[in-house]
Amino acid sequence: GKVIEFVPTIDEQDLKVKVLSRKIIESEVDFDTPRTIVSFGRGIKDDPEQNVKLVEQLAKELNAEIGVTLPISKKPYVVSSVLDSKYMIPDRVIGTSGHKTSPLLYIAAGVSGAMQHVWGMKDSGFVVAINPDEDAPIKDECDIFIKGRMEDVIPLLIEEIKKQMLVVEA
C-alpha cells in the first residue's frame, strides 16, 4: 500500500448552517383541562405491552388523559412502536421534569410515588393508587390504596365501571 498525506481545509463557508424550514410541533397531551388522569410507572414491567393497553383501556372508559413517570419517558421497556410513540414520551411526564396537574381524579397505576412525581399530582382532588408494594411512598399520597399488580386490578376496575355504566364527562 501507499500512504498519501491528506490535510483537510475548512473555510468559513463550510461552517455555515442554513435553516430550510421551521415547524412548531404542538403537543397533543392536555393536562390542564382533563377531569381524570391515569398515570403509569415502572409497574408495567411484567408485561409492558399488555399493561400499557390496559391503562389505555381504563383511560378510555373514564375519558381520561394518560400520564407517565419520568423513567417511563426514557423507554426502559419494549412495547410496540405505536404505544411507544404515543405514551412513552416526555410530553406525558407528570412531575418536576414534566407537568403539574390537578384533575378531580388521579389514578396512579404501578407508580412508586417518588417525590418528583408526587410534586406534579399532589393537587389532585382524589387519588387512587395501584401498587403491589404496600410500603410504596405513593401510599402516603393517595385517598385509596389498592395493593395489587396493575394487570390484576385494572381489568376489575374496567369491569366494574362498565357494570355501573359510570360516565365521566370531559
Question: Where does each model-flagged region fall?
Answer:
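N-terminal glycine-rich FAD/FM-binding segment characteristic of electron-transfer flavoproteins
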Residues: 1-170
